[in-house]
Amino acid sequence: MRTILILNPKGGCGKSTIATNIAGYFAMRGKNVSLADCDQQCSSNDWLAIRPEHLARINHVPLKKGRLHVPIDTEILILDTPASIHDKKMVKILRVAQTMIIPVLPSAIDIRAAERFLKDLIKLRRKTVNNKIKIATIANRVNEMTIAADKIEDYLDNIKLPNGRKIPYMALLRATQNYVHAAEQGKTIFELAPSRTYYDREQWKPLLRWLNSKRSLP
Ligand SMILES: Nc1ncnc2c1ncn2[C@@H]1O[C@H](COP(=O)(O)OP(=O)(O)OP(=O)(O)O)[C@@H](O)[C@H]1O
Ligand SMILES: [Mg+2]
């Protein structure tokens, strides 16, 4: 089973949005996908609950007594995580994932929070057995052609690990109500009218290529 983790302790950066869209994308490609919501807000579970039956099926992963009960035939597990996650829980989650995506919003506050989080993450990564987890960043909810858009691109494009390797910056997702409308209907943007979401689908391509390649695996 492959596990993809969406993590950034900063609230509202788009973790659940990215998690549900990735889950739907792989389910549409015929994979047996489970979506686990480690978040008490249960945004991903709420989304799953209203997902129309005729769309590609995604398994719900019940959280019982702090443990996730993942269906055994799962091929791809998507882990949506809460804001303000504490270190102990983060280490636990980091141990089981092969791939991690960090969404960041284009604001000075979010960039500073991401800097702090990445520092902590690098420390934790050394401590965890899973030092090989592949990480990528994405900029989310970006209003293009703004100074904030330039700043977030510049920041994400230049993040390096202590060994000098770059953390790949994989996508810029624009701010659009398409994500809001899709979420309201238990859908992904890949399940809305292509004419309306063409631009968004294009923006997802580099991230999806990365997820489909060995580069995103240890
Ligand atoms: N690219 C986008 N364009 C417009 N709205 C977006 C975009 N991405 C996310 N949103 C909206 O922003 C809000 C926050 O997104 P989301 O719930 O995915 O964030 P989160 O990181 O999971 O939040 P939390 O930390 O509270 O779990 C939601 O209303 C979502 O629909
Ligand atoms: Mg969430």
Where in the sequence are the language-model features?
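Walker A (P-loop) phosphate-binding motif
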Residues: 1-28
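Switch II (G3) loop of P-loop NTPases
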Residues: 71-90
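Beta-strand-loop-alpha "switch" segments that mediate conformational coupling across diverse proteins
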Residues: 143, 153-190
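Conserved C-terminal guanine-recognition region of P-loop GTPase G domains, centered on the G4
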Residues: 112-132, 140
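Inter-motif core of Ras-like GTPase G domains
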Residues: 88-108
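NTP-binding/hydrolysis catalytic cores, primarily Walker-type P-loop NTPases
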Residues: 188-218
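Short beta-strand-centered segment that lines the nucleotide-binding/catalytic pocket of NTP-utilizing
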Residues: 29-44
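P-loop NTPase switch/communication element
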Residues: 41-56
